[in-house]
Amino acid sequence: EIAQCLVGSEMCIRDSSYLMSSGFEDIVSDQDFPVTERLSKWGAHDHLVFNRLLEDLKTEAAEGTAEEKTPHFRVLQTSSSHEPFEVPFRRLENDRLNAFAYTDSCAGDFVRQFRELPQWKNTVIVFVPDHLGAYPEHIDNLSVERYRIPLLMVGGAIREPRRIDVYGSQHDIAATLLAQLALPHEEFVFSKDMLNPASPHFAFFTVPDAFGMVTADNQVIFNCQAGAVVVDEGTVKGKNLPLGKAYLQKLYDDIAKR
């Protein structure tokens, strides 16, 4: 098995103890790139990090170890789409949107080349942002749009193209992936399989002093410090407020037991 984390910035160094305790054996950070390639505020630009991962995959394929070393779990975090949005690429006039287009092109190039390798047929690639917030500009923490992000799954192991319109949270990715692999996920007590029609489809998010609970029929954000609802939208207004409060309490109860 392979467990690898690749980040072009110093984040892997700062979080190395967490990553190692989580089972990552190979951690690639900005220090693993020549100084001449660390040209952004964050370290190495995204195309260099994707190229590093692609070279590792090509080496495994050439050595005939690609099949032997499965299953493998790799995490690559992009950084060029963060401020100051300076990238070696120019397609759009707006610097923010241009940086997003650059990272998108890096991911697309990686997928196109990865499709030619033997590992592709047994691989699932998950694309998910860690957060939204850089665009539209000036969006704040008390807006539902601040938390609306996509989840994309591609790869040779995907049977057919589909679009699934359900609400979920980042912590639901664990149960969703493990369920497709027929692996247990009970230890992830707050994670649910988003592809299971019997699962409740909702998203929950928190920021300091506020939480949000989102379903198809109601979107609520509650400011805990002010003790006030700041967003209540949808066809069944108010429905998710008590549910969100109960969920937040359950989170605190779980933390208290650890």
How should these model regions be labeled?
Residues 1-8, 12-13:
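Single conserved hydrophobic/aromatic residue that forms the stacking wall/gate
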Residues 14-64:
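Formylglycine-dependent
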Residues 63, 67-74, 119-125, 157, ...:
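Loop/turn elements at helix/coil->beta-strand transitions in domains of secreted/extracellular proteins
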Residues 65, 159-258:
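Membrane-interface soluble catalytic domains
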Residues 102, 106-143, 152, 177-184:
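Metal-dependent active-site segment of extracytoplasmic phospho-/sulfohydrolases and closely related
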Residues 32-35, 53-109, 113, 134-136, ...:
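Active-site His/acidic residue clusters
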